[in-house]
């Protein structure tokens, strides 16, 4: 959950081309934004990317954006650029994936001080058009979970539809 009295995220991180990206950028203003906290080493994150990449292609014109925050095995931009670019290529990801640092609890706390008790990868934050975090979901129930995955997709789309309608 978010820390008491805080509703938005202030990260400013490099994308894989080295350009700094934040939620204040023109591209994200007035849009619903999904922030996925991920690692290329995390199997459930790969399942989530496999869902989000085609979902984004089909829905981006509706005023919704996705940002991936990649926490990798090393706090090394060149190493992580390679691992995260492989992830982008494998799943055909068209949204920005940013290098957020090393995958450890301190790393996440440093990049996202607004989030209380980060508990695992992937964690997905749903942000409304005003920039407020409205929901945080930890974990991902992938296709192997059958009905749970169908329920997840339904709930995901209902949530995005309601945020877009505001």
Where is each model-derived feature located?
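Loop/turn elements at helix/coil->beta-strand transitions in domains of secreted/extracellular proteins
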Residues: 28-33, 61-67, 91-96, 129-132
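Short active-site neighborhood of thiol/selenol oxidoreductases, capturing the structured segment around
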Residues: 22-52, 65-66
């Amino acid at each position: 959950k978010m820390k008491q009295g805080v509703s938005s995220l202030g990260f400013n991180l490099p994308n894989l081309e080295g350009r700094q990206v934040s939620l204040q950028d023109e591209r994200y203003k007035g849009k619903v934004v999904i922030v996925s906290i991920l690692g290329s080493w995390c199997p459930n994150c790969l399942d989530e990317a496999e869902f989000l990449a085609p979902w984004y292609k089909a829905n981006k014109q509706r005023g919704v954006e996705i940002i991936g925050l990649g926490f990798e095995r090393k706090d090394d931009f060149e190493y992580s650029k390679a691992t995260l670019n492989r992830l982008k290529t494998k799943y055909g990801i068209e949204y920005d994936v940013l290098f957020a640092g090393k995958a450890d609890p301190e790393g996440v706390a440093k990049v996202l001080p607004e989030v209380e008790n980060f508990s695992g990868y992937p964690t997905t934050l749903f942000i409304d058009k005003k920039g407020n975090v409205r929901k945080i979901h930890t974990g991902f129930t992938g296709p192997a979970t059958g009905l749970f995955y169908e329920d997840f997709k339904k709930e995901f789309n209902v949530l995005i539809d309601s945020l877009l309608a505001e």
